[in-house]
Amino acid sequence: LTKLNNDIYQHEKGLGENDRVYLVAASIIATLGIPGKVAPLEKEELKSLEEEGNTDGDIILRKIKAFLKEKQLPQAKKDLIIRTLQNTLTAENINKAENGESQLKRVFAKIVDDLGIYYKIGLTTDFTGKLFNEMYGWLGFSQDKLNDVVLTPSYVATLLVKLARVDKDSYVWDF
């Protein structure tokens, strides 16, 4: 993860801290897929076109929307995720083709090549926690190394919801 961040930082100009985090998140969501419902996005599907509605960012965004729809999340949550990722994914500068390839396609390919195997063999809470911790460190305000992300397995979170008698759909319980 550190190598991926450094590689993107050094070789992909014009991407800020938030952009790198959003691109990793978007790439992971787009490549997860849902068996029998949403096919995972493959690198070859990104064509680096500058045609309106068919840029690499548009393709990734459509795949994310299909994934979120099948996950049956509340509409407000889907809208929040899309709004957060959309500005980065549809920015003209990262969708502009240079030497036949957009910056977005290059970054997407790096992310899939570096992280894809972990998701293909089965996403684990431990790996996801490490991913969140690493990406949190990419952000400029995260100087405090004592902060850490802890992911609770869903069965434990469900038990805690029942014990605490809170709304399980609260954003506090998202991860």
Feature roles, as predicted:
Residues 1-49:
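Accessory nucleic-acid engagement/destabilization modules that flank
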Residues 29, 33-140:
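Long recognition/docking surfaces used for binding and targeting
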Residues 142-146:
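Active-site-adjacent structural elements in folded domains
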Residues 147, 152-175:
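Conserved S-adenosyl-L-methionine
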